[in-house]
């Protein structure tokens, strides 16, 4: 059972006639105090050099939000950067922020380089807070064996064994090459983010790129990952794929086609053999889809589905236009799910409405 309860806005530019400020790429976490934090990127355009991570906080389970401010001051760095990080609350109460930043030596170039089909170079970074996200250590660069930047666009997870795991595809180098291949990399830390390895592959299949990878743990050592599968050779977006591990991420299954023609997606464990997933569908019948999944015998079997945002959800924009009228020009993505307790969950995503980048959350009730 999936029930839509209500929607709220985390960030919307209060003065769009004065400043160009857009919100993108949210990530939610629930602190041990019960307070929620939302990381998101704010900048004047989608690939603007001044895009950087901000933090908002909620004391009422996501109904209202207060902007805390910038995650850190990246103007101190020797090279201009823009960054995107996501929070994870550890069992001991510490908060880990993990993500990546692009090096923007030429502010007139975008992140993607059309001439080569490559991307700006970058660094994978991690930071820690021991006061519920009010103060953070200076982001530390994570050494990696791959020359390509790892797309750690989702949060890391803390497994029941105490390890931290994160997933990512590889961005091509600025010259358009990818010497490591079209693979998915698992990053592992045994010491709460102090050191990391990136020598395990969670995905290596038919030269398909596993963008926007997300991971969750079910029973101890049983992991499931979902990806936005992209075939660069044919420029085709394939249905979301999932792969699983039963040994703590050391080895992984071949990917399974879910049949859901989504792009950025995410998933969480509800207990037993049940997962909940959320998908950005941007082609046929666009919108945000939430599904309950029976993952018995490590096979993907949808048992319930609900569109929580999009034309068929009956959503109306602020100007009264239906989503069916707005979706021709609407952009949205990077959805995620957060368990609030009991049968309540919060879904987050970004959207561009009336030319403005917003961060939205939706309260749901779900039962297996």
Task: Identify the residue ranges that each predicted region occupies.
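Asp-box/BNR beta-propeller blade signature and adjacent active/binding-site loops
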Residues: 1-368
